[in-house]
Amino acid sequence: MAATKKSTATAAHQIIPSQPTSMSADKFLFSCLQVFVLFFEWARSFLLSTQSRLSAVPAENARLEPSKPISEEEESVIEKPASSITPRYSNLVDPSTYNDLGLCSALPLRVHKFAHLADKGALRAQEDWKRLVGPIRNFTGCLSPRFNGIAVAVPECIPERLEIVTYANEFAFLHDDILDNVGKEEGDHENNEMAAGFGSVLNPADNVKMSASGKSQMQAKLILELLAINEPQAMVLLKCWEGLVKGESGSQHFNFQRLDEYLPHRVINLGQTFWFGIITFAMGLTISPDEAEKANNITDPAYATLALANDYFSWEKEYIEFKQNPTSDDMANAIWIIMKEHSVDLEEAKKICQDKIRESCEEYVRRHRQFEREATGKVSTDLLRYLAALEFSISGNVVWSQYTHRYNFHKPAAKENEDTDDEGAKSDDSKTTLNDSTDSTVVDVKTPATSGLLSSANDVLMSRTAKSLVGPILDVQLPELPDKVVLSPSQYVKSLPSKKVRHHAIDALNIWFNVPEAELEVIKEAIDLLHNSSLMLDDIEDDSPLRRGFPSTHVVYGISQTINSANYLYVMALEMTQRLNSPACLNVFIDELKRLHIGQSLDLYWTANVQCPSLEEYLKMVDYKTGGLFQMVAKLMALKSPMAGRVPDLSNMTTLFGRYFQIRDDYQNLMSEEYTNQKGWCEDLDEGKFSLPLIHSLTTKPNVRLQAMLHQRLINGKMTFEMKKLALDHLAETKSLEYTKEMLGYMYTQLQKEVDFLERQTGSENFLLRLLLKRLQV
């Protein structure tokens, strides 16, 4: 209680004025009375805290009574963590009703006033896991007989966010339990799958493939709910969480010999950045990266306290799991490290660990108080609130850990025949190993060491030429020519950055179709081949010099070679579709390919003849051209679905999605800085393409100058910078860009309604599809 004494003495010094030589007796008595009151308040605080420590008993023997809020008068004499937080959403818990084992006696315990919302979030997460992923056995997360973990660890969470924050933490617990019971390779796979889910939102421009597993479905649902509350703060949490799972991948089970080696690793593994994201999102805080970096030296002992306390209370649970499922000869736990480092038994190691927890807790309180005195007014209030909230996290975690079944009740030894049941709690994708994926690649194919393009064929020809100059002319069994040259342009365009929207769409739709994995991969490959072919041909036909920030394929390989390669991809796509062993699938492939070319022909015709189409003509062209591949995907998946006669009709949704995708592209072409970097500024104007904004402008208010510029573009091959500015001025005058964005909003709303309808029709929620739509929202 040294801190309380100091603060009281300081307060007394501030209240009592310097006594002048002639001071009235009344004033002197009043000052003495003030000192007496302050001393009485301090003494009461000291007795309450001392009583708490002296009466400490093991938590499992303590009474499980409800949280007992104390009066405002009582609260005023108990030391608060900092002046940065004025409690709004929590009650102070009477220290005589719980036991902190003397680990953090300087810190108060608060519990959220709406703790039932935290319980609701934890239970909802467990139900979603059972429904989307698999059975849950011997699991306990945030819930406990006394306190919910989040309700005491983040007691000042904004009430509207408490349920989803607890849901997120429960999901993290479920994921963590998988890691505790699998080997390193499978653990890395689980973490990589989780990281891909976050990466698909954080870095949509990267080629990130999100799994279609049940766990990814649940992750997508969680991400959508977080983004809907506050997108910027949610993105910080997702970035922090991504950093955690990426850091965990490949880092399990190090053979640490000393605690000072282990603790920095454990702090990261515990989720220092993750907890930063949880607190800031929960409390609605915005902290700049620079400020967060400055605070690291302050918060290090806080996270060391949390890490050590977690290891202390979870020792029995982790040791049982270690003995039942040994994935290493070593444990990653502070108790284990201390026993090795100091050659002591378990009880002595626990005492040492307790001392370390107290020391690090006291050090954080000291650093925090000093920082607050020196930095107030120099740093943001949100940073100070975050540092104060960490004190609540420490006391909340210590007390909750003593009551939670997660650490105090342990599952029995697993029977051998129950191994497959444990696997049921993970996604189907979790059984895939790195070896499975590499078997299907061409990396292992050995190529000749020569540099010639016709290497193997030339070697044979040269050897025969040495024997005879006539022989090859009569030889009708010459080696087959390699496809290296014809595929090179297509491999180039395939290597360019891509958002893989079509892949994500296929994975999302398969929530409803359940197409077997092998056939699903065939459909993906066929669609990829068609898409890459159309990209190469489109860039030639539009005379576009850039594709995703790189030179277009025909700029690198020439027009003739690019056309030939694109045509070859059509043949490969047809061959791939044949592997589906379905005449109906071939008919779908041919029909949609014909429609795609009809749509493209009209787009080219309008541009070449500077003929503005009507809105209806434009939309039908989009349905044929852009929507064609989405229609093909849905129809092929419906034909290969094992749910014959029960597959949903997605024609409305795929048509709307194709329109949304194309019109979004029209809008981004004129408005997006990212699009400018990848394709050039207002490239559609250079190409003379009749996009929706241009069609709206010309039909709303016909303009001779704009039409003249389009004709001059046809002559010159592109528009100058100044001409583009003039064109944009006319679009602004007719509010065509505002109209386009408004139409995108209407379509987005209708797409969400289509998803609602299909979810009701199929009885299956589709969070992957909802997340994809969210990523594409303008």
Swiss-Prot record:
Motif (NSE/DTE) on chain: 310-318
Annotated binding of isopentenyl diphosphate, by residue: K499, R502, H531, R548
Entry binding sites for dimethylallyl diphosphate: R547, K625, T626, Q662, N669, K679, K689
DDXXD 2, short sequence motif: residues: 538-542
Keyword Translocase applies: no
Co-factor(s): Mg(2+)
Segments carrying motif DDXXD 1: 176-180
Residues holding Mg(2+) 1: D176, D180
SUPFAM superfamilies, A to Z: Terpenoid synthases (SSF48576)
Chain positions covered by the region annotation Prenyltransferase: 415-778
Amino acid composition bias (Basic and acidic residues), ranges on this chain: 414-431
UniProt keyword terms in alphabetical order: Isoprene biosynthesis, Lyase, Magnesium, Metal-binding, Multifunctional enzyme, Repeat, Transferase
Binding locations of Mg(2+) 2: D176, D180
Pfam families found in the cross-reference section: polyprenyl_synt (PF00348), Terpene_syn_C_2 (PF19086)
Pathway named in the protein's UniProt entry: Secondary metabolite biosynthesis; terpenoid biosynthesis
Gene Ontology terms describing biological process: alcohol biosynthetic process; mycotoxin biosynthetic process; terpenoid biosynthetic process
Domain comment, as recorded: The conserved DDXXD motifs as well as the NSE/DTE motif are important for the catalytic activity, presumably through binding to Mg(2+).
Subunit structure and binding partners: Hexamer.
Homology family: In the N-terminal section; belongs to the terpene synthase family. In the C-terminal section; belongs to the FPP/GGPP synthase family.
Protein name: Preasperterpenoid A synthase PvPS
Gene name tied to this protein: PvPS
